[in-house]
From Swiss-Prot:
It is found in: Membrane; Secreted. One of its GO terms (cellular component) is extracellular region. The chain crosses the membrane at residues 140-161. Residues 1-19 form the signal peptide. It comes from Xenopus tropicalis (Western clawed frog). PROSITE patterns: CRISP_1. Involved in sperm chemoattraction. One of its GO terms (biological process) is chemotaxis. The gene is crisp-a. Residues 36-138 form the SCP domain. This is Allurin. SMART domains: SCP (SM00198).
Amino acid sequence: MDTFNFIICISALFHSTYGDDGGTPMLDTETQNYLVDLHNLLRRSVDPTAKDMLKMEWSPGAALNAQNAAAKCVMQHSSATERQIQDPFNYVCGENIYVTTAKPDWAAAVNSWFNERNDFTYGVGPNSDKMIGHYTQVAWAKTYLLGCGLAFCPGNYYPYVSICHYCPMGNMINSIKTPYEAGEWCASCPESCEDKLCTSNPTA
């Protein structure tokens, strides 16, 4: 049977695993590194190119929150408080959710979010009424911390729940059309650049 999937996102439009076994095991180091590398690869591929795109790194705090959110097995976003981390700074994080009927592959989840760029025009926003918030969160320049979790929820129609948290959150309503500053790669990095991404540690 074909795998059905459904995706949701939240990032303050201002406006291994599983859920029912009594625990919330974290993703292993190999998976963490893969997810960071995949996000950075996609962030390097934005079009137009980005002057200020930060390199992502793993956040244990964001990962714990994402895992706890997945393990709740509910089809709704976690609250701002549940998406908050204190280290290295006090951030509220954005949240992307991907649910499937079969155990997902993380590449499919992350690429499904990023592929919303096909319905997005930089400086204009979504084409018609298309969903683009997953893409803009993945491509949000000032987001640099990532944490993800996965849970199996056998009582759900879509039993596999994959969640990533992004800190600090993106998708601020006043800049949703420009999730990063367009221009020559790394032209606006405050200090260093590594393979098209800014590597300076942000401040609060």
